[in-house]
Amino acid sequence: MEEVIVPEGKEQQEKYDGSSIQVLEGLEAVRKRPAMYIGDISLKGLHHLVYEVVDNSIDEALAGFCDEIAVHINEDNSITVQDNGRGIPVDMHPKEHKSALEVVMTVLHAGGKFNKDSYKVSGGLHGVGVSCVNALSTKMHVEVYRDGQIHSQDYEKGKPLAPVHVISEAEATGNWEQRKTGTFVQFWPDDTIFTETVYHWEILANRMRELAFLNAGIKIVLKDKRVVDAEGNCKRETFYSEKGLSEFVRYIDGTRTPLISEVIHLNTDKYGTPVEVAMIYNTDFNENVHSYVNNINTIEGGTHVAGFRAALTRVMKKYAEDSKMLEKAKLKDKDGNSTIDPNDFREGLTAVISVKVAEPQFEGQTKTKLGNSEVAGMVSSAVAEALQNYLEEHPDDAKKIVEKVILAAQARIAARNARQSVLRKSPLSGGGLPGKLADCVSKDAAECELFLVEGDSAGGTAKTGRDRVHQAILPLRGKILNVEKAMEHKVFESEEVRNIFTALGITFGTEEDPKALNLSKIRYHKVIIMADADVDGAHIATLIMTLFFRHMKEVIEQGHLYIACAPLYKCSKGNYSEYCWNDQQRFDFIQKYGAGDEKAIKTQRYKGLGEMSDEQLWETTMDPARRMLKQVTIENAAEADRIIAMLMGDDVAPRREFIEENATYANIDA
């Protein structure tokens, strides 16, 4: 696990040399078990390679020695990362007896971040560093501009081809015209290791944008040299944030209607660790808190989130009680005690929490939950002070927040009654399963699947075509409720929503939190959304995904949610047939079997799942051996939050703009 980088002061520059590099572990196992080091060997792991290299540059920036990072996707799908930091040390390592640059690039867990004289804290989740990237690349080229010279070395699959040597600017690959210090790294991912080797612009852009918000004042330039316009200019975007998290919250909340005039923003290290928090209230009903430790998105929260929530509840509750607004709203019991709930203070809240911790302890299912107990108090103290000051200085905003809290409390009481119906109808409490559910025979959740099927017609076909032992079917009547626009009690008043909860066996209440979602008795480990392959079907699938993202996010985070891919066409030539999932596959079939003549091919277009026979539905969409499933994951929670709010919320203008920008790439039924 890598630590985080926090400025130590310019006097530390003298200490950043070969003796700063400490060797903790060798590289041998990386190529044999790559998933252990980068998470997986598909799309996520592929992009993680870029993050590892960029993290080194971010570390330099946080230490105060770098303010610009360039990330390029090259024509050959290699990646280039260049910064204007101090440059990796190149002098002789005292123990390894080779250049410190070679040690950093070829030994796992070797780097300045393990020496507190060089960096106080540093980024990166897995903490494997550039040596792991080197090991998983067919080749890598590195250049370091330091002490007036450019030092270079090349590698193949992690092994150096020659010692570190000095080259001229004319021989260099990096752009050193404006920079006279820094590090340049270019690597080619190994296609014998990764199942996917094509980099996605949006994935990298989202992470670079996130890093720019989290580290104010750093300019990150992303270029895609694979995409060139008519003037010969490649695709390019610059990410820079002057105000950091304050702008991040505005970006996330872009399509929501703000409740208060300003972002509440604090940035301090006076309580023992650097804490930055930005928060704002909107008129929506959801809580959206995004937390980071050393630039790592802690999707499971942790002690920093607990400290934030404790301070928010304590300060807001005191203000609400002192203002006598709770009494007027009759939110006090017979003894005069407040019946307000901590959750009431978080409805309509969007916040980003970022802390820098020297030695973070991560725990939880995905190792993205902060466990350092001391951080809770530090964050709580910092947030309490800033929030108290804001409420005193902005009484009009304070009143609006308390009024919203009161509405949230009143809605919560209504929602509690609606939620109780979910508990009462849970199969675990003896209330029985939904009448429309065709359950499977097996009771082993790990091997059971639940298909959420659009419409009774397709539901009937799926019931007869399924594997009855392992596959259950729950037909849904038309478009389910858009939960993005609904208050919580309305969500649980919806019969379709209640049926999904009940069928899954999901209840509320854990040992830690009586209101938390409880997945301990989930009845299926695969929940598969099966909708028509047209625009209406995509809309229904999006509504269902929104329900899970807002009210059952743990189902997604634990890897249970999938989307079935139904074919659009069945193309036949004589007795030979193929299913086609898109127009390109249909075109290829026509070219191959009809010599390009569309009339020579019999094409059946499926406007809906109900048009297929049970046998066709089984062999194309439900058979585990032949079907295609897309797993729903949350790669970037803040960006997912923003996109869902934009697409499913009330504000039309941003949604129209998004559609216009992406219409070229859309598959539109017309």
Model features per residue range: what roles?
Residues 94, 363-375, 579-585, 589-590:
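Helical (often loop-to-helix) elements that flank the catalytic cores of nucleotide-handling enzymes
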Residues 87-92, 96:
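A short glycine-centered beta->alpha linker in the GHKL/HATPase_c
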Residues 410, 414-429, 444-449, 460, ...:
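C-terminal interaction appendages of subunits in large macromolecular complexes
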Residues 32-51:
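Conserved short strand/loop->alpha-helix "switch" segment adjacent to the catalytic nucleotide/phosphoryl-transfer site
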Residues 1-20, 27, 49-51, 59-61, ...:
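GHKL-family ATPase ATP-binding module
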Residues 29-32, 36, 59, 63, ...:
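Conserved helix-loop functional segments at active or binding sites
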Residues 37-41, 112-123:
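Glycine-rich ATP-lid/hinge loop adjacent to the conserved G-boxes
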